[in-house]
Amino acid sequence: MNTEATHDQNEALTTGARLRNAREQLGLSQQAVAERLCLKVSTVRDIEEDKAPADLASTFLRGYIRSYARLVHIPEEELLPGLEKQAPLRAAKVAPMQSFSLGKRRKKRDGWLMTFTWLVLFVVIGLSGAWWWQDHKAQQEEITTMADQSSAELSSNSEQGQSVPLNTSTTTDPATTSTPPASVDTTATNTQTPAVTAPAPAVDPQQNAVVSPSQANVDTAATPAPTATITPDGAAPLPTDQAGVTTPAADPNALVMNFTADCWLEVTDATGKKLFSGMQRKDGNLNLTGQAPYKLKIGAPAAVQIQYQGKPVDLSRFIRTNQVARLTLNAEQSPAQ
C-alpha cells in the first residue's frame, strides 16, 4: 500500500518538482547542477519550474531534463509522461529543398549567356578589324591612283618638252635672216671712213696704185666691225650696272617644303591652280608661291617638313594615324583638315 501511495504521489508531482526534490535530497544547489551539466542557472531554474524557454528547442530541453534526471538518480521512464506535457515535440518546418535540376537549368542558362557574350565580343573585334583593313586599303588605293595621275602628268609634260626644240628652231630663222642688214650697215659705215680720214698724212704712191676701190671695200668688209653688240629693233640695251639691279622681295605666302623620303604631293592655291602635283624624291625641296589659302594633299606626311610664313606646319596628327594628309593653310597660318 505504501509503494502504491508513493507511486501516485510521484505521478501527481510534475517533472520539475521531482527533479527539485531529488536535488534537495542529495544536498545539491542549482549552481552545482548547472556546473555539472554545463548549463546556465536560469535554464536549471526553468526546468524545475516546468517552464519551456521560447528560445530553446524542445529537443534540447528534453535532453537537458534527461541529463538532470541521471544526475539526481531518477529513472528516465518515470519522467516520460511529464516530458510529453512539458516539452512536446514540435514538427520542424522543413524548407523546401531546391531541385538539382533547377541549378542545372540555371547553370545551362549562364553558359548560354557567356557564349552569347563571347560571340558579341568576337563580332565587335571582327568588325573593327574589317573596318580598319578597308580604310587602310582605301588609303593605299588612293595613294596609288594619285601616283598614277602624277606619272601620267609627268609623261605628258615630257612629251611637250620634246616638241619645244622644233618651235625654237623656227623662231631662230628671223634672227639669222636679219643679220645681213647689220652687215650692210657696217659696210656703209666703212665706206664713209675715207672721207673722215682724208686729212691724214700722205701715203706712199705705190701703195695707192696697188689698192683699188673695190679691194678697199673688200678689206673693210672683212675686218670686224668695231661695234660687236647687236640689239633688236626697238629694244633698249640691258643695264650692266649691278648696283641698279634690285632683288624681288620675299613673298609672305611662300610655301617651303623639304623631303626626307619619297613622297607624293599635290598643292592647289585659292584660284584652283595646281602649283605642284607629282612625286618628290628624298632630299628634295620645293618653294611654291601662289594665292592663299593653299590646299595640300600629302601621301606620306612623315616624309615632308613644311614651313609656311616662316613657321613650321604641324603634321603630327596625320603621322600618328598613318593616313593621307589633307589640310588647308590659311593666310594666318592655321592648318585645317
From Swiss-Prot:
Residues 19-71 form the HTH cro/C1-type domain. This is Cytoskeleton protein RodZ. It comes from the Bacteria. GO terms for cellular component: plasma membrane. The chain crosses the membrane at residues 112-132. InterPro entries: Bact_Cytoskel_RodZ, Cro/C1-type_HTH, Lambda_DNA-bd_dom_sf, RodZ, RodZ-like_C. Residues 1-111 are cytoplasmic. Residues 30-49 bind DNA. It is a single-pass type II membrane protein. Residues 133-337 are periplasmic. The gene is rodZ. Cytoskeletal protein that is involved in cell-shape control through regulation of the length of the long axis. The helix-turn-helix (HTH) motif in the cytoplasmic domain of the N-terminus is involved in the formation of spirals to maintain the rigid rod shape. As this protein is anchored in the cytoplasmic membrane, the HTH motif may contribute to protein-protein interactions to form the RodZ helix, which is localized beneath the cytoplasmic membrane. The C-terminal domain may be critical for determination of the rod shape by probably interacting with enzymes required for synthesis of the peptidoglycan layer, including PBPs in the periplasm. Residues 145-167, 208-218 have a biased composition (Polar residues). Belongs to the RodZ family. Pfam families: HTH_25, RodZ_C. It is found in: Cell inner membrane. Its main location: membrane.
